[in-house]
A protein has these predicted regions:
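Conserved catalytic region of serine esterases and O-acyltransferases that act on ester linkages
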Residues: 2, 15-19, 200-201, 205-263
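Flexible, charged surface loops at secondary-structure boundaries
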Residues: 12-16, 84-89, 123-124
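Charged helix-capping and loop-helix junction motifs
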Residues: 108-117
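Hydrophobic anchor at the start of a short beta-strand
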Residues: 48, 127-129, 186-187
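Substrate-gating cap/lid alpha-helix
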Residues: 142-190, 208, 212-213, 217
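Active-site segments of SGNH/GDSL-like serine hydrolases
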Residues: 95-103, 121-165, 192-195
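Acidic carboxylate-rich catalytic motifs and surrounding loops in phosphoryl-/glycosyl-chemistry enzymes
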Residues: 133-136, 186-201, 230-233
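Conserved SGNH/GDSL esterase-like catalytic core that processes O-acyl groups on lipids
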Residues: 19-109
Length: 263
C-alpha cells in the first residue's frame, strides 16, 4: 500500500468532514450497514457522511437487479452530482462488485469506459479512490457447467459465453491494475477471493465480516486512522439481515422509502 500523502494526515488532525461514496452490487448491499458502522466508529470525532449506489445485480453502465425490481446504472444515478455539491474536506470513493455489466452483455471496453468516467470525475475532487478487482478466475474457479448454472439463475437471458466472460474479466482487471499504477490516489484492494462462498461470486455468510474488515482497514490505513475494533461474525449477520429488510420492504414491496443516502 502506498504511503498516505501529508495533506490527509494534517487534515485529519483538524477533525474534518469526510464524505464516503460506496458503489457496488450485492456484496456491498449485504455489508453496507456493517461497513458504515465500523468506519464511523474508527473515525470517532470526525464527521462522517455516506452516500451509496448499491443493490443485488446492479451494474455500472447497464440497468440490473433481481426479481421484480431493477436499479438504474450507477453511472446515471446522480450520486456523483450530489457528492460534488456536498461541502466536505475529504472524499473517499469505493468502487466494488464490478462484473454484473459483463453478464448483462456489456462489452469489456464499454464497462472500462464507464469506470474510467467515474474514477476520472472523482479524481477531479482529489478523492481517495479504492477499487476491488473481479475476484473470479473463471478457468480456475468455475467450470463451464457451473458457469451455465450460475448464468441461468442470476442472469437469465444472458448470451455471454464462458470464453467471452473469461476474456472480459482479464481485460477489466488489467485496466484496474493499470489505473492504480498510474494514479497515486487510486488503490486496488486485492485478496478478496479468499472470502467468497461456493458460487465464487458472493462473500460467504461466515466471512462477510472479514471481507469488509479488510476493505475498511485498507481505507483507514490510507487515511492514517487507527482501527478501533475488529468486526465480528454477529456484525456480519446483522448487516445481512438489514439488507434483507431493505430488499423486502423497500425494493420489492415498497412499503418504506430508503434513506436519502441511497441512489
Amino acid at each position: 500500500m502506498r504511503v498516505c500523502r501529508k495533506t490527509i494526515v494534517s487534515s485529519m488532525a483538524s477533525s474534518p468532514h469526510i464524505l464516503f461514496l460506496f458503489m457496488g452490487a450485492s456484496n456491498l448491499a449485504r455489508g453496507y450497514s456493517l461497513l458504515t458502522r465500523h468506519i464511523s466508529s474508527c473515525f470517532g470525532k470526525n464527521k462522517t457522511e455516506f452516500l451509496n449506489a448499491l443493490g443485488p445485480g446492479r451494474g455500472f453502465c447497464a440497468r440490473g437487479g433481481m426479481f421484480n425490481f431493477t436499479y438504474p446504472p450507477i453511472q446515471d444515478c446522480r450520486i456523483l452530482e450530489v457528492a460534488k455539491k456536498k461541502s466536505c474536506d475529504i472524499r473517499v470513493v469505493l468502487i466494488t462488485d464490478i462484473g454484473n455489466d459483463l453478464m448483462y452483455g456489456v462489452l469489456a471496453d464499454t464497462l472500462i469506459e464507464s469506470l474510467d468516467g467515474l474514477i476520472g470525475r472523482a479524481l477531479q475532487w482529489d478523492a481517495e479512490i479504492f477499487l476491488t478487482s473481479i475476484h473470479v478466475n473463471l478457468k480456475k474457479d468455475v467450470s463451464p457447467t457451473m458457469f451455465f448454472i450460475l448464468k441461468s439463475f442470476f442472469y437469465p437471458g444472458s448470451s455471454i459465453t464462458y470464453e467471452e466472460a473469461d476474456m472480459f474479466i482479464i481485460k477489466v482487471n488489467g485496466y484496474l491494475e493499470e489505473k492504480a499504477r498510474q494514479n497515486e490516489r487510486v488503490y486496488l484492494i486485492s485478496g478478496m477471493k479468499s472470502f467468497t462462498g461456493m458460487d465464487k461470486i458472493h462473500y460467504s455468510f461466515l466471512k462477510t465480516h472479514s471481507a469488509w474488515e479488510k476493505i475498511a482497514n485498507e481505507i483507514c490505513h490510507v487515511l492514517k486512522v487507527p482501527v478501533q475494533k475488529k468486526m465480528r461474525l454477529a456484525d456480519g449477520i446483522s448487516s445481512i439481515i438489514a439488507n434483507l429488510y431493505r430488499l423486502i420492504f423497500c425494493d420489492m414491496f415498497r412499503f418504506k422509502k430508503k434513506g436519502r443516502e441511497y441512489f
